[in-house]
């Protein structure tokens, strides 16, 4: 992609939006409007801060420093708090590792030494418990999550301690294990509380992606414990993983014949509502006769498609299931019932451990309109698929028989 002229700041802008979309908002258009509106307001306020009010902030490493010289990184500091989303800085800051441009698509090779902070078994258990509901960690595989946990360090805080200060450089992402914390924002020399954390949550993630100062101050209102993750590890694993996941999802969607008739913009919308699910060997993924509510693409592993025979019986006297197809990575299943608007015509079982990309039909219809309106563009393909997978004589009218 080196021959394509990418506007300065676009990569960081889209990285931030991509991470935020991981929250699975119900309406992507409304979410985008709200996100970029806050982004614009943050830029205006940042401009006011630098041009109108030459306030100074204190960092952990130095004495008072003029903001215009220390234009560093910003932070939304909360998934839930009502804070402005930061934007890439227009000013020049000192050269540091923290400010280096990060493009996850270009940095395929990673030779940096792994950061490891030794922990006792008890600390590891507490850390895992604190991180189990952190949205940013949801899409990490086991190896990546293990590297993140290895790199995190415990920080014990006291009452009234400033964890981060508005205007400071942002070097760490924090997960709350325990304690309460106030979120304070100063504007026009007026400081106000915009929210509070109560023994759960995380903050500081966007400061690791944008070149603007911290957007808020976080103060402990009780004794507590935090787990920190350094900027380099955060970007190397989490940001890069999100970018790779999205790229992989796009590749899968483009390879599915079912979506050949969709416009590029429509396929990109599909990527935004895809989730992942893992199934164990022999686990049933869909059941014949059940209502169809999801469509599946195999990310890794194999899936066996079976249908109940009308002529063969199992040992319990019921209709025996007979395999009619064996699906592998990149193949998909579960879409035919959505197209025909009928119950599942077959069952699907995992063969070994299986990871599937899952698309909810309601999300699909919300983004692209009723399924049939979209699918009619390529209806001949579905007829071919029906014959290929189930045979021309298969009765789909009553899959429960």
Swiss-Prot record:
PTM (free text): Phosphorylated by the activated catalytic chain.
The secretion signal range is none
| Chain positions with N-acetylserine modification | 2
Q: In which tissues or organs does this protein occur?
A: Four types of regulatory chains are found: I-alpha, I-beta, II-alpha, and II-beta. Their expression varies among tissues and is in some cases constitutive and in others inducible.
Q: Which residues carry this modification: Phosphothreonine?
A: 212
* InterPro entries in the record: cAMP-dep_PK_reg_su-like, cAMP_dep_PK_reg_su, cAMP_dep_PK_reg_su_I/II_a/b, cNMP-bd_CS, cNMP-bd_dom, cNMP-bd_dom_sf, RmlC-like_jellyroll
- Which terms does the UniProt entry file under GO BP? modulation of chemical synaptic transmission
Post-translational modification Phosphoserine, affected residues: 47, 74, 76, 96, 347, 392
According to the UniProt record, where is the region Dimerization and phosphorylation? 2-135
Task: Alphabetically list the UniProt keywords.
Answer: Acetylation, cAMP, cAMP-binding, Cell membrane, Cytoplasm, Membrane, Nucleotide-binding, Phosphoprotein, Repeat
Tell me the residue numbers annotated for binding 3',5'-cyclic AMP 2. Answer: 258-401
Q: What does this protein do?
A: Regulatory subunit of the cAMP-dependent protein kinases involved in cAMP signaling in cells. Type II regulatory chains mediate membrane association by binding to anchoring proteins, including the MAP2 kinase.
State whether it acts alone or in a complex, and with which partners, per the record: The inactive form of the enzyme is composed of two regulatory chains and two catalytic chains. Activation by cAMP produces two active catalytic monomers and a regulatory dimer that binds four cAMP molecules. Interacts with AKAP4. Interacts with CBFA2T3. Interacts with the phosphorylated form of PJA2. Interacts with MYRIP. This interaction may link PKA to components of the exocytosis machinery, thus facilitating exocytosis, including insulin release.
Question: Would you tell me the protein name for this molecule?
Answer: cAMP-dependent protein kinase type II-alpha regulatory subunit
| Protein species of origin | Mus musculus
């Amino acid at each position: 992609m080196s021959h394509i002229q990418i506007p300065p700041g676009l990569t960081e802008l889209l990285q931030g939006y991509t991470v935020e979309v991981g929250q699975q908002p119900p309406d992507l258009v409304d979410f985008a409007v709200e996100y970029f509106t806050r982004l614009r307001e943050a830029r205006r306020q940042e401009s006011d801060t630098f041009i109108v009010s030459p306030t100074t902030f204190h960092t952990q490493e130095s004495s008072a420093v003029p903001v215009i010289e220390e234009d560093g990184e910003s932070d939304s500091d909360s998934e839930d708090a009502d804070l402005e989303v930061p934007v890439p800085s227009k000013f020049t800051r000192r050269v540091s590792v923290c400010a280096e441009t990060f493009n996850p698509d270009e940095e395929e090779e990673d030779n940096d030494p792994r950061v490891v902070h030794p922990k006792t078994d008890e600390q590891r258990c507490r850390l895992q418990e604190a991180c189990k509901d952190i949205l940013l960690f949801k899409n990490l595989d086991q190896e990546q999550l293990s590297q993140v946990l290895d790199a995190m360090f415990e920080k014990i805080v006291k009452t009234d301690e400033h964890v981060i200060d508005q205007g400071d450089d942002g070097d760490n992402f924090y997960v709350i294990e325990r304690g309460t914390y106030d979120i304070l924002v100063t504007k026009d020399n007026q400081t106000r509380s915009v929210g509070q954390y109560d023994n759960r949550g995380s903050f500081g993630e966007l400061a690791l992606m944008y070149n603007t100062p911290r957007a808020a101050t976080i103060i402990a209102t009780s004794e507590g414990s935090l787990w920190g993750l350094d900027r380099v590890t955060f970007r190397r694993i989490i940001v890069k993983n999100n970018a790779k996941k999205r790229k992989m999802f796009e590749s899968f969607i483009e390879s599915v014949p079912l979506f050949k008739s969709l416009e590029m913009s429509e396929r990109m919308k599909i990527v935004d509502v895809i989730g992942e699910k893992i199934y164990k060997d022999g686990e049933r993924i869909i059941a014949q006769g059940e209502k169809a509510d999801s469509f599946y693409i195999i990310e890794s592993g194999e899936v066996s498609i079976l249908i109940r025979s009308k002529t063969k019986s199992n040992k319990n006297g019921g209709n025996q299931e007979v395999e009619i197809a064996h699906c592998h990575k990149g193949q998909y299943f579960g879409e035919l019932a959505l197209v025909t608007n009928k119950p599942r015509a077959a069952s699907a079982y995992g063969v070994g451990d299986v990871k599937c990309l899952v698309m909810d039909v309601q999300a699909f219809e919300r983004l692209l309109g009723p399924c049939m309106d979209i699918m009619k563009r390529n209806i001949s393909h579905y007829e071919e698929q029906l014959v290929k997978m189930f045979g021309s004589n298969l009765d789909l009218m009553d899959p429960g028989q």
